[in-house]
């Protein structure tokens, strides 16, 4: 059936859940306003995006094409989006859907849409 199949805790606070429906599995991170203090508009999204270095590559394992980012390069911009250390024992992993990534992309898109509207005289 549908519903929450797992709840993730940090100390005594719920920080996430895994929920399922008939057609989807969702990994949810807590985002309720009641858990947050000092809320403010996000600034610096342009610099965040400009610091990222999108790349293409060929995977060594099978020669297939890849597109995205190099984890240790992203770690310099967004440490919370990357797990592990450059040249560490374990290969690094990156969360492409991190809240920091999505929030900065949306903030910059909103800024650009506002600028286009101003330039178009709307």
Where would I find each of the regions flagged by the language model?
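C-terminal intramolecular chaperone/autoprocessing and neck/assembly modules of extracellular spikes
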Residues: 3, 7-101, 108, 112-122
